[in-house]
Amino acid sequence: MVKIIGLDPGISKTGWAIISLNEKNNIEFLGGGTISTDGKLGTGERLHIIFEQLKKVISLYSPNEAAVEKIFVNKNPKSSLTLGYARGVVILALKITKLTMNEYDANYVKKSITGNGHADKDQIIFMVKQIVKNLSIKCHHVADALAVAICHAYTKGSCFVE
């Protein structure tokens, strides 16, 4: 059985989701959540929290593969830089736990899940609920992480929409 962790890095909230693929390539949602940090803490402390919590998630679920959403540069360079720090910590945690990282542009993830590279958060949540049966999810950070994991499964050819 293949287990994939999908990650949506962020300094305030890093979304994560774990899926498994069985022999028939059916997707099962095993778990998901957010790693939240307090904005009152220093950047270093926030990054340390993300790193330690992500290592715990990886240890608990033992995924075989990892998929991470690439960052985009927005109008605020400080926000982009801070997001880059969070992403760097996520990459480090994956490297330390010996997980191979696969990266996907946000537009590619959206297109593979919804058919629209510019889909909004509600469309992502709607589609992941269509793909993964009996899913109750409201947090867009978890939905984004789940979309990244599903995108990886589709891209690898491990899974196909029926």
UniProtKB/Swiss-Prot annotation:
Function: The RuvA-RuvB-RuvC complex processes Holliday junction (HJ) DNA during genetic recombination and DNA repair. Endonuclease that resolves HJ intermediates. Cleaves cruciform DNA by making single-stranded nicks across the HJ at symmetrical positions within the homologous arms, yielding a 5'-phosphate and a 3'-hydroxyl group; requires a central core of homology in the junction. The consensus cleavage sequence is 5'-(A/T)TT(C/G)-3'. Cleavage occurs on the 3'-side of the TT dinucleotide at the point of strand exchange.
Annotated SUPFAM superfamilies: Ribonuclease H-like
Protein name: Crossover junction endodeoxyribonuclease RuvC
Cofactors: Mg(2+)
Gene name for this UniProt entry: ruvC
Species this chain originates from: Wolbachia pipientis wMel
Localization terms from the record: Cytoplasm
Lineage: Bacteria, Pseudomonadati, Pseudomonadota, Alphaproteobacteria, Rickettsiales
Cystine bridges: none
Superkingdom: Bacteria
One Gene Ontology biological process: DNA recombination
